[in-house]
């Protein structure tokens, strides 16, 4: 296990690991304990009472955060004809078909999200083994396989984030930057928490949300007491 730096150790002393904080207090503490010299990302981590090995307990989707993430997403769209023109007009960073598939096969990944029209998925599927492990494969559940390319691009540019439960039952999602006002981070957090609650699988038994924490890129995690705020 890597040894933590002196700044991290000092910052961690400010966090009571036995305590779950009010969400506003937790956000303020995450900003205070950030040790990065850059505008670090603030992330929320959920530990859920689900068994991801079972198909009926998979959790995956996307949501537009009210205040965005602070990161400009580079969007690659696989489309042809009028849909390609629509994508360009909507602000896609890259639009094409087989030409970009060839570039990706050669190791090009200067993008963050892929949107594909359904008729292009046969071609995109050819690079599924490359895209899948990187979390870049478009999927109908996240709204990235669609003929509504203008809407998809608009949502991504506005701050849409994807979430997916991992093998251990955890979900990690960015909710902004440490430079954000506290209120904006709290609002994004609440939206994300509400979304995860609504995504609860019917087959999930027992306690669903076991633990919630917020953290910055290079800072300590801060547990959140979810009972201290109102979820819609």
Swiss-Prot record:
GO terms for molecular function: rRNA binding; structural constituent of ribosome; tRNA binding. The keyword Kinase does not apply. InterPro entries: Ribosom_uL1_bac-type, Ribosomal_uL1, Ribosomal_uL1-like, Ribosomal_uL1/biogenesis, Ribosomal_uL1_3-a/b-sand, Ribosomal_uL1_CS. The keyword Ribosomal protein applies. Keywords: Repressor, Ribonucleoprotein, Ribosomal protein, RNA-binding, rRNA-binding, Translation regulation, tRNA-binding. GO terms for cellular component: large ribosomal subunit. One of its GO terms (biological process) is translation. It comes from the Bacteria. It holds the Pfam family Ribosomal_L1. Belongs to the universal ribosomal protein uL1 family. Part of the 50S ribosomal subunit. Interacts with RNA helicase CshA. Interacts with VmlR. In stalled ribosomes contacts MutS2. Binds directly to 23S rRNA. The L1 stalk is quite mobile in the ribosome, and is involved in E site tRNA release. This is Large ribosomal subunit protein uL1. It comes from Bacillus subtilis (strain 168). The gene is rplA.
